[in-house]
């Protein structure tokens, strides 16, 4: 599995689920992370920008536990004031650290972070409604050492298109998908992923299939064999062996119908 920059910067577009961990029970955050991991999310963005140290330490502990439970990469968003804060965040196993523009530390701290971990480990989140940035303004952060930008509260205007197509930064769009369309956001050549909480109670694979039908390449497990080609058991089902995907341990024999096979 690709967990670093190779995972994100592959040609395929991604759907990343975000989880707001502020004022949330850690066990609930962990359960939701596991649910997304099982149900088709390509990655997670888990954040808690609370400023007090006790809350940060509890969040970091929770993030380390989540990293051991899930099989998809995750980004971490946390309050960072100095290099040590960033180091603790990335040592949770997170593939990227996301810092809000309003909470950006001093430039010297950013340079120390990127000197140690690389430009690809650091992202800045910008509210495009409150503080629109064009390509040149985005590139200032790239030149500072930040490789990725997360753009939220966006409108799909010509100005937005020019900004994302013109910047040197890797572009991720964070959106609730209430006004904007998933396929449209992913159709921008420079948009590498959409970060959303829209699929907390919805079928991610169904959305991926719809996006793929529109010609957008996105990770999707698809069988090359049609259900009709299988020799069925007397009950009209396909016999299957169920294994633990981590250990390959055989758990049981089961039967699958066409609806389950096509999911």
Segments the model singles out, each with a brief description of its role:
Residues 54-77, 109-128, 156-178:
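Alpha-helix-loop-beta-strand connector modules within alpha/beta enzyme cores
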Residues 49, 92-109, 149-155, 188-206:
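Glycine-rich phosphate-binding active-site loops on the catalytic face of alpha/beta enzymes
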Residues 19-22, 72-84, 103, 126-132, ...:
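Glycine-rich beta-to-alpha transition loops that act as phosphate-gripper elements at the mouths
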Residues 76, 80-93, 136-141, 160-193:
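Catalytic cores of alpha/beta
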């Amino acid at each position: 599995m690709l967990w670093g920059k190779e995972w994100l910067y592959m040609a395929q577009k991604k759907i990343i689920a975000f989880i707001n961990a502020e004022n949330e029970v850690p066990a609930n955050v962990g359960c939701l992370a596991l649910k997304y991991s099982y149900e088709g999310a390509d990655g997670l963005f888990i954040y808690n920008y609370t400023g007090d140290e006790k809350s940060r330490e509890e969040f970091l502990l929770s993030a380390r536990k989540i990293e051991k439970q899930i099989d998809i990469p995750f980004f971490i968003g946390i309050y960072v004031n100095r290099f040590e804060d960033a180091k603790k965040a990335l040592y949770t196993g997170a593939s990227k650290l996301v810092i809000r523009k309003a909470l950006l530390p001093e430039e010297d701290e950013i340079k120390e972070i990127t000197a140690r971990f690389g430009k690809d480990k650091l992202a800045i989140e910008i509210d495009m409604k409150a503080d629109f940035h064009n390509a040149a303004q985005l590139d200032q952060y790239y030149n500072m050492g930040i490789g990725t930008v997360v753009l939220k509260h966006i409108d799909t205007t010509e100005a937005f298109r020019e900004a994302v197509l013109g910047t040197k930064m890797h572009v991720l769009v964070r959106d609730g998908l209430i006004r904007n369309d998933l396929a449209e956001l992913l159709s921008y050549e420079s948009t590498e992923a959409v970060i959303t909480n829209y699929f907390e109670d919805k079928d991610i694979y169904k959305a991926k299939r719809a996006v793929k039908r529109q010609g957008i390449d996105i990770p999707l497990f698809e069988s090359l064999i049609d259900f009709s080609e299988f020799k069925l058991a007397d009950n009209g089902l396909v016999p299957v062996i169920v294994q633990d995907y981590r250990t390959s341990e055989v758990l049981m024999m089961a039967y699958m119908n066409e609806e389950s096979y096509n999911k």
